Amino acid sequence: MKVYKDLYSNDEVCSDAYDHHDPFDNADLSSVAFEVKTSKVPKGEEDYGIGYNDEEGADQMNVDPNVEMVVDVVDKFGLQSLSLTKKDYSSYIRKYIQRLVATLQEKNPERVEPFKTTVSDFVKHVLANFEDFEFYVGESLDYEAGLVYAYYKGEEVSPRLVFLKDGLVEERY
């Protein structure tokens, strides 16, 4: 199993247990980011998907209305919600990309130009749809580390989470 950790905070933020998709259904951005589909699950009740196997599907799962429902990836990895204004995000992402570029120049110089080109399209998409996003950081609440981008696709009841690949370290267990 692979676990993805933030490059700077070392917080675990995702794993390969969740299928990776093109971010925002845009294959051009897949060189810099990946997206995972999440599920809402009852907090503290781990049935490992057994409750989803009935004929009516997950929507008909009997859940006590007093039980708190959480987003599986957010809960499992202890992601913390972060409130940002568009101005705050613009300032943050400028500094974060500079930091990532410096790291790439040191460790993987041939990756710098393709990263800079594609990540600018990623940021443009986020800024153009800013109201649709929620943001998370890792468990350590390191605000200089990478962000996790959450948005709702269509009528889905659980958010999709998007991660910048170059801000992650892959660890095998």
Swiss-Prot record:
Where found, per UniProt?
Cytoplasm
Q: Where is the TCTP domain positioned along the sequence? A: 1-173
What is this protein's function?
Answer: Involved in calcium binding and microtubule stabilization.
The protein's UniProt keywords, in alphabetical order, are: Calcium, Cytoplasm
Tell whether Transport is among the UniProt keywords. Answer: no
What is the protein named?
Translationally-controlled tumor protein homolog
Taxonomically, which superkingdom? Eukaryota
SUPFAM superfamilies documented for this protein: Mss4-like
Q: Which family does it belong to?
A: Belongs to the TCTP family.
Alphabetically, the GO molecular function entries are:
calcium ion binding
Q: Which GO terms describe its cellular component?
A: cytoplasm
Entry-linked PROSITE patterns: TCTP_2 (PS01003), TCTP_3 (PS51797)
